[in-house]
Amino acid sequence: MLYDGRALVLTSEKEACNRYCLLEVSPLGVKEIAAWDCDHVWKEEPLLFTDGQNIGIIKAGREMVYYTGDFSHPEIIAIKDPQSILPKNAQERYFQIVSDSDQIPVCFEDQVYTNQARNFALLEFDRENKQAKWTTYSHIDKKDLSHHDMSSDACPKIDSMKSWKQELYAFTSGESQTSINKWGMDYYALVKIFSDGRVIEKIFESDCLKGAGKKAGVNGLFTDTDYLILTPLFKNDDWKGKQKLFSLATRELCDIALPRGMSKHKLQNMTDNCCLTYLYDRGLKELALCQID
């Protein structure tokens, strides 16, 4: 989301899943900024990020399309020597990218492709000189997570990452390699990490969910504020399926109250003054911008 309350949405067209659209959502309506075909959608999933004023789209780890001003004349910026950092088979996965610095965290899959990122890389972006390069490729070191699976080499999954005040945060939804919608998660945690994936601090983590007697789990999504959106996987949990917010600044949990008639919407992102919600039912059905009281 931008500082002025506009939201940017990267989506694929319903009739052609290999055609992507970049949309601007504002109180004036929805405006298409760009559209392009992607021949290898699964391997080259584009990623969208913003610094609150400008927009960047990372394509296949090799180049960036950078929009400034009125977004009508984007610049193409080649990412320097990506093969020196990124493994050959690493594939970008789109999870909300949030950064307030020149270090942009990006999630990846490698070897096993199930749309569940377990690796990340940091992209160093010099906005003034229009230069970009990958600086590290790693995964979350699970040995400091209380309920990690010692019998498996699987790395923790990464729901979302955020670079905030020169520190790196990640939300992991556990290590399970089976369907979490069918069996639930094994654990989840919010951690502060070093760039090599070592855990600095466990801000919070769940109990071991596999022995809880019922399916459970929570997904986490960082926003353009200090808040993390927490979304329960199941509606019969202690939160009754309702989203909550966790503040990185105050370390407090709070409830979300959406406007009347929008109970089926989910919160996707927010600034200090407004938020973006969506209704998803076998595809994106609705988007809404709401003011925050």
Model regions and ranges:
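Structural signature of eukaryotic scaffold interfaces centered on beta-propeller domains
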Residues: 1-3, 47-51, 93-101, 157-164, ...
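Recurrent small/Gly-Pro-centered beta-turn motifs in extracellular repeat architectures
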Residues: 9-13, 58-60, 106-111, 171-174, ...
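Structural motif
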Residues: 16-22, 61-68, 113-122, 177-190, ...
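Short loop/turn segments that connect beta-strands within beta-propeller blades
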Residues: 25-29, 68-72, 126-129, 194-196, ...
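Surface-exposed loop and turn segments in beta-propeller and other repeat-based domains
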Residues: 35-41, 77-90, 134-154, 200-214, ...
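Loop/turn-rich, solvent-exposed surfaces of beta-rich toroidal or solenoidal domains
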Residues: 172-174, 183-186, 206-243
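Blade-level signature of beta-propeller repeat domains, shared across WD40, Kelch, NHL, RCC1
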Residues: 264-293
